[in-house]
Amino acid sequence: KLFDQTIIYKTNEKPTKAINRKTYKNFLEQNLQKKLNNDLQIIGQTRLVTNGSKFSYKNNQPIESENIVGVHNGIFTDLQQYDKKKTQNLESYNIKSDSLTFFENISKYANDQNFISKYVEYLQSIVGNYSVALQVRGENKVIISSNCGSLYYYFEKDFFCFASEKKIGWAPALALTNH
């Protein structure tokens, strides 16, 4: 099975700092090198805090819910009721991000044989802008979706990568195709 395990690395810092950390390099070394000749899925995200405390590990991406691992770029404006002033001032550690709430909500549908239909219905019921990538745990696929038209991708026979920002540097991803 392609996804027999999901390994997560996340940190609360700027991407340029994160990728230069020794812990990140060790993470890649320990987890990627043994997979380069096998199927491999990597989902990454850097988070601009719009709501939910950045100091709460569970709010930082990739997000893990019971049945879903995913990333979200954008903002959902109708998923939570909370004191927006506390969020804007980063005062509340316990406020969940809109992304965490989103993935927890769709996690309920993960084992439904009509998951895609339920997912699309859910997307149509929420307010906000999103580009989302997710994996239902144990499934051999990644689902990507956007309502703001910003999904950029590269595809070859055995390689697919995507981004929600046009300015992504494809060179590191393309280097993986030459293994």
Task: Give the residues covered by each predicted segment.
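Conserved short alpha-helical segments that host acidic/polar catalytic motifs at enzyme active sites
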Residues: K1-H179
